[in-house]
Amino acid sequence: MIERLDVVEEPRKEWDLRMEIASAPRSGAVVATLRDAEVRRGGFTLGPVSLQIDWADRVAVTGANGAGKSTLLGALLGRVPLTAGQASLGSGVLIGEVDQARKLFHGEESLLDAFCAAVPDTEPVEVRTLLAKFGLKSDHVLRSAGTLSPGERTRAALALLQGRGVNLLVLDEPTNHLDLPAIEQLESALDAYEGTLLLVTHDRRMLDAVHVTRRLDVADGKVTER
């Protein structure tokens, strides 16, 4: 039975099946807000920042390494404590973060078992099909999740977001560790995604390929919309 499933689930070649990222039911009109927000860490200060992200905004966040891009994301999502000001999330916001999802695939259990534990209402056969869409074939699903390469772990995380459905998709340098076919599939999936998007990237190709409605530039802890 398992062998038969492997044959049915196996795509003819990697990335043959179309990658998608499912949208959950929409959130409220206001997704996230910062009001005079500041974050101080050692000698670094982000802000003060006043910023509102609305439903279906597609926001690219750019800036040099160490400029404060990830700190800005953490402040918006309520993960980074503020030194001053206020942060709030809107009603009905379902956050999907690739970096957080990747952390679920580091243990000794198989990729299939780890994935099924994260989406308990999804049948294993459906999980196999979903993973195959993201280039993780039958020889990946029974391996220990901890043996996945960084790129395979990112694919598994993207597949998990597809399985769960999100309405605020957060991607922090998503092209790291992905090969070109995977990047192209991701770009296509992002174009079809209908929720709110926060995309942090220094990849000029992705910035040109993915439709965004707003751009935030972070430099020396200051945030400028352009």
Predicted regions and their residues:
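ABC transporter TMD-NBD coupling linker
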Residues: M1-R18
